[in-house]
């Protein structure tokens, strides 16, 4: 059969029989990246990277281009779906100990940073009020770097303030970075298949494996169909659910919004940044909130890979997950009590997860040794 020849590569790929739905998100991320590249190309055809025309070109895409509203919403809401999938993908990796495949985990964390950079540059492109001010606040953090900060900021802006050169280079970066993401994704998958994926038990599954096709292709397609249905329903019925009302106004450097905030998927890092009153301290905490993922494979001390049989780590993991949601919510609120205190406490708990990981692993080993 012709389709069997096409899928022979997948058929020859042995996968554990007991992997759950949480392992579907890798293929979903691949689909998301394909959607983003395709819709991004069609948007780039009509977009104008000029501060006087950028906002108007977005309006033109939405109103005049055939199906432009759908392409634009697919790209914008598709980015939110991308981040939902990647956060679940990372959470699964943390819970089931997938990070012990070090090369795969480190390449994946690098991918996350590249994806966040790409999304940030993309958020600036419509040149709406919130786009402009979010870009001003975030890029200004570079000035906190001793000695080099001012020069780096001027170089990034292409002048002494955010202006036309800034928008041009942000568009160039937003266009080129996805190709780097695709290349690194290929390496990520290649490194994963060197060792093979883990499973919910965290055990060696060599004795109990099945072909990827047709079993897991069907399983992936079901989840993919469900997610794409939700995406299209959101685009059709709630197209502005993730948009900030301020961004429907053209950027005005003379009027500051009452409350500056980036897109929802950056709010956990932005909340940690805001919770520290010192500029350099906040910038370091912002960087560490993502960079700390690089340390996870090296601080694992438990003899058990997965958290399935580690109740104390399960408690810490779900505390960490709820803290992530709490910081995201608090970052949407103005910088005033009680939101400042909530963000500060939540930020401490966020980093405590990574500190407690090796300590609890060591304690579990002691308990197992003594029983």
Swiss-Prot record:
A GO biological process held by the record: mitochondrial electron transport, ubiquinol to cytochrome c
Location relative to the cell: Mitochondrion inner membrane
Record's protein name: Cytochrome b
GO cellular component, one term: respiratory chain complex III
Assembly notes: The cytochrome bc1 complex contains 3 respiratory subunits (MT-CYB, CYC1 and UQCRFS1), 2 core proteins (UQCRC1 and UQCRC2) and probably 6 low-molecular weight proteins.
Role, per record: Component of the ubiquinol-cytochrome c reductase complex (complex III or cytochrome b-c1 complex) that is part of the mitochondrial respiratory chain. The b-c1 complex mediates electron transfer from ubiquinol to cytochrome c. Contributes to the generation of a proton gradient across the mitochondrial membrane that is then used for ATP synthesis.
PANTHER family associated with the record: CYTOCHROME B
Encoding gene (name): MT-CYB
Cofactor(s) the record lists: heme b
GO terms of molecular function: metal ion binding; ubiquinol-cytochrome-c reductase activity
Miscellaneous comment text of the record: Heme 1 (or BL or b562) is low-potential and absorbs at about 562 nm, and heme 2 (or BH or b566) is high-potential and absorbs at about 566 nm.
Cofactor comment: Binds 2 heme b groups non-covalently.
CDD domains attached to this UniProt entry: cytochrome_b_C, Cytochrome_b_N
Gene3D superfamilies referenced in this protein's UniProt entry, alphabetically: Cytochrome Bc1 Complex, Chain C (1.20.810.10)
Membrane topology classification: Multi-pass membrane protein
């Amino acid at each position: 059969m012709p389709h069997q020849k096409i899928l022979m590569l997948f058929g020859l790929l042995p996968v554990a029989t007991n992997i759950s739905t949480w392992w579907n998100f890798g293929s979903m991320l691949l689909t998301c990246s394909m959607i983003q590249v395709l819709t991004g190309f069609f948007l780039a055809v009509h977009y104008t990277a000029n501060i006087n025309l950028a906002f108007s070109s977005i309006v033109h895409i939405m109103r005049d281009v055939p199906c432009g509203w759908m392409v634009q919403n697919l790209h914008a809401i598709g980015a939110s779906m991308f981040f939902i999938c990647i956060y679940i993908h990372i959470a699964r990796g943390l819970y089931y100990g997938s990070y012990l495949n070090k090369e795969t985990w480190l390449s994946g964390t690098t991918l996350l940073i590249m994806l966040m950079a790409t999304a940030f540059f993309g958020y600036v492109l419509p040149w709406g009020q919130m786009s402009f001010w979010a870009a001003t606040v975030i890029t200004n953090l570079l000035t906190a770097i001793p000695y080099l900060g001012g020069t780096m900021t001027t170089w990034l802006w292409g002048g002494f303030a955010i202006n036309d050169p800034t928008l041009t280079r942000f568009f160039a970066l937003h266009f080129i970075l996805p190709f780097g993401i695709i290349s690194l994704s290929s390496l990520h998958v290649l490194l994963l298949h060197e060792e093979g994926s883990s499973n919910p038990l965290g055990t060696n599954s060599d004795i109990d494996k099945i072909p990827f096709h047709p079993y897991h292709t069907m399983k992936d397609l079901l989840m993919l169909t469900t997610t794409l249905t939700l995406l299209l329903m959101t685009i059709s019925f709630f197209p502005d659910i993730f948009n900030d009302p301020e961004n429907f106004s053209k950027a005005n450097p003379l009027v500051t919004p009452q409350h500056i905030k980036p897109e929802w998927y950056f709010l956990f890092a932005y909340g940690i940044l805001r919770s520290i009153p010192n500029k350099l301290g906040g910038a370091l905490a912002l960087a560490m909130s993502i960079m700390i993922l690089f340390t996870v494979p090296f601080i694992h001390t438990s003899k058990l890979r997965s958290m399935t049989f580690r109740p104390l780590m399960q408690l810490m993991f779900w505390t960490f997950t709820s803290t992530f949601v709490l910081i995201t919510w608090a970052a949407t609120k103005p910088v005033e009590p009680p939101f400042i205190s909530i963000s500060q406490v939540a930020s401490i708990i966020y980093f405590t997860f990574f500190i407690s990981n090796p300590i609890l692993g060591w304690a579990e080993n002691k308990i197992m040794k003594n029983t």
